[in-house]
Amino acid sequence: MKTWPAPTAPTPVRATVTVPGSKSQTNRALVLAALAAAQGRGASTISGALRSRDTELMLDALQTLGLRVDGVGSELTVSGRIEPGPGARVDCGLAGTVLRFVPPLAALGSVPVTFDGDQQARGRPIAPLLDALRELGVAVDGTGLPFRVRGNGSLAGGTVAIDASASSQFVSGLLLSAASFTDGLTVQHTGSSLPSAPHIAMTAAMLRQAGVDIDDSTPNRWQVRPGPVAARRWDIEPDLTNAVAFLSAAVVSGGTVRITGWPRVSVQPADHILAILRQLNAVVIHADSSLEVRGPTGYDGFDVDLRAVGELTPSVAALAALASPGSVSRLSGIAHLRGHETDRLAALSTEINRLGGTCRETPDGLVITATPLRPGIWRAYADHRMAMAGAIIGLRVAGVEVDDIAATTKTLPEFPRLWAEMVGPGQGWGYPQPRSGQRARRATGQGSGG
């Protein structure tokens, strides 16, 4: 496999970047659109949808279940019924949203559906969700990939207890389909911790937008009443988690990066993202439907609890590795990342140390002491976030090469081009020189890849 030479930024990065739609919001909208169609409420449209491997896997899954998805690029329409054909088989790839959102949907059908995925996906946690479906009366063969869901055309619902300590997607997957259960659903989280709670809040917010009656007023308990899921138009926000990699370029280079279309009010964890950037002395400015981040002249190590936003960990770890030499950063609340696309804690520790850094694992996180890094190969482990972290480190460390930049197709197929355009020509990529007088580069992703 050919390595990708990460562009360096010897001067402050100054760029405007347009990132495609949110993967998390796109795949939730697709599931809700499928449920509305299955209830006979009509077709839903999704505008600004992300087109990446994860969302293509979701589109394929819905079509496997018998639904119809029309449209090109980022404009999609979902219609039809849940009527899987004989031998229906869903490929989850490495997509946690497909792995955990689609089985409850398949349980509403009347034909067995087999689920499988990439070899690496077979280590991702799924047993608590399958056990919950069994508790609700669904016949499920298997305890992990591959497994089979044997629906009988309806699902009574009721009350279920589940330990979602390994993934908040267990809760979201149940809640998304719950309004179509005969008696609705009450979900009680029984674990000691709940990672990525903002993503459950996103699920609840989108359910309300679809007219679903959901009560999440009691901590660790959610109740969805049976009823209609409205067909509607879904407008997808830019993917703010993907945007963090680009904003990190402003932080590590002391430059200025503007993200277009940044929402004033978001179903994504925008407040958590901005709080971390400010903790690193970045200046954050909302203006003209965009977000501008001005990086500091330098920053020291930092302590941050990433329990709510574990997806940011690789980017934040890269920032920690590039802090003032000798300063220490402590990243906590992220033990659950050991069950993500790869064991992200082990992967980050290994790769930072291989480049001469100092990183060690703790029971629930990482401790990183910033030390001068050297050139070398940064391994992505087929993980999109790991690949992006390598790109961030490469901004400051000449000679870093990412072994699998194609891993970014999972959520941002155009990442290499957007990154190169942001950093600018002459840094290892043959892009045209900016026009005379052009002050800031613009990198635009249309989300049509994958």
UniProtKB/Swiss-Prot annotation:
Residues 426-450 are annotated as: Disordered. It is found in: Cytoplasm. Its EC number is 2.5.1.19. Keywords: Amino-acid biosynthesis, Aromatic amino acid biosynthesis, Cytoplasm, Transferase. 3-phosphoshikimate binds at S24, R28, S167, S168, Q169, S196, E311, H340. It catalyses: 3-phosphoshikimate + phosphoenolpyruvate = 5-O-(1-carboxyvinyl)-3-phosphoshikimate + phosphate. GO terms for molecular function: 3-phosphoshikimate 1-carboxyvinyltransferase activity. InterPro entries: Enolpyruvate_Tfrase_dom, Enolpyruvate_Tfrase_sf, EPSP_synthase, EPSP_synthase_CS, RNA3'P_cycl/enolpyr_Trfase_a/b. One of its GO terms (cellular component) is cytosol. Pathway: Metabolic intermediate biosynthesis; chorismate biosynthesis; chorismate from D-erythrose 4-phosphate and phosphoenolpyruvate: step 6/7. Phosphoenolpyruvate binds at K23, G96, R124, Q169, R344, R385, K410. Its main location: cytoplasm. It comes from the Bacteria. It is an enzyme of class 2 (transferase). Belongs to the EPSP synthase family. Catalyzes the transfer of the enolpyruvyl moiety of phosphoenolpyruvate (PEP) to the 5-hydroxyl of shikimate-3-phosphate (S3P) to produce enolpyruvyl shikimate-3-phosphate and inorganic phosphate. This is 3-phosphoshikimate 1-carboxyvinyltransferase. It comes from Mycobacterium tuberculosis (strain ATCC 25618 / H37Rv).
